[in-house]
Amino acid sequence: MKDSLKRRRYMIVRDQYEGFHKYEDAPAEVAFLKYRHRHMFKWTAKIEVFHDNRELEFYMVKDVIKKEIMPFVVMLDNLGSCEQQAERILDGLLNAYGPDRYYSVIVSEDGENDGEIEWNPDR
């Protein structure tokens, strides 16, 4: 028997975008990060869904992120840290789909180093 109260379901969508950033306060050991440099930023969004036939559709969610959210993520000359970019994506998801579901957004530099932010409606 399924204990549906204990099960949580999620959809996961991914994509990437080209961007530039710099870390102006970089420690001396990584001083090269103080200068503007390019990455392929890869993002992953994990979104809670409320039944096993998903009320959200992969393609539609990805389209909302690409068309309505990403312009605000990449509009800056310095995109900031992966965590700052993830925060902007999360803010867009909260605006699009509401605060009553769990979200996790991960942004990576070239698929190597990640920053993650979560929204947990249970806290």
What are these regions (language model features)?
Residues M1-R123:
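Charge-rich, low-complexity N-terminal segments
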